[in-house]
Amino acid sequence: MHRLLGITAALAAVVALAAEPAAGPWTKKVQAGKDVYATLKTSQGVITVRLFSKEAPRTVENFVGLATGERAWTDPKTGAQVKGKPLYDGTVFHRVIPGFMIQGGDPTGTGMGDPGYRFADEFQSGRTFDKPGLLAMANAGRNTNGSQFFITTSTPSNLNNRHTIFGEVITGYDVVEKIGNVPRSAEDRPQTPVVLETITLSDKAPNAPAAPKPAAPKSTPR
């Protein structure tokens, strides 16, 4: 899903260019069965997602590693290996379709980029696209995951067992909808760039908005 439902022959030919690298320090941040939360600060607002580390550990480890910069990736402009620099910071949501999804995570910002490697799908959990707000991997076909991801604003059942679901939005879904409805070109590219500024990670759920305090009782004249 670099074009979500389509992929050019040229990109398909690139799929085998690099094997998945060995595990690294990013994997230590992801403990199987323990929730990980990612907060995406965008130019349109903040989105927080819960990552499914038990159900899609390989995918979550990859996302975490690229978000922190602990996983090496290839700079598409220079071809150099990058270590210690988060891939996602400063990237854009390059494709948005109202009532469907928003897509980002491409270091080239074109929908054709990747981190210089591919890794396998994870469908063993049986999760399906049964609700909006699911976070999933974009790909160019079976077992071609890289860095691109999308967040749904619909329930696209035709994507079941085609794209690994590895998280869900827990706060900021209104921001997802807002991004999905920005003015866009005929190619579904936002006319004004929507930037993913930073991703921060935590093993604790964000605090829910404080409930409004009850109004003080009116004093009764004596």
Spans of model-derived segments:
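Structured alpha-helical
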Residues: L11
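Cyclophilin-like peptidyl-prolyl cis-trans isomerases
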Residues: L4-T8, A16-R222
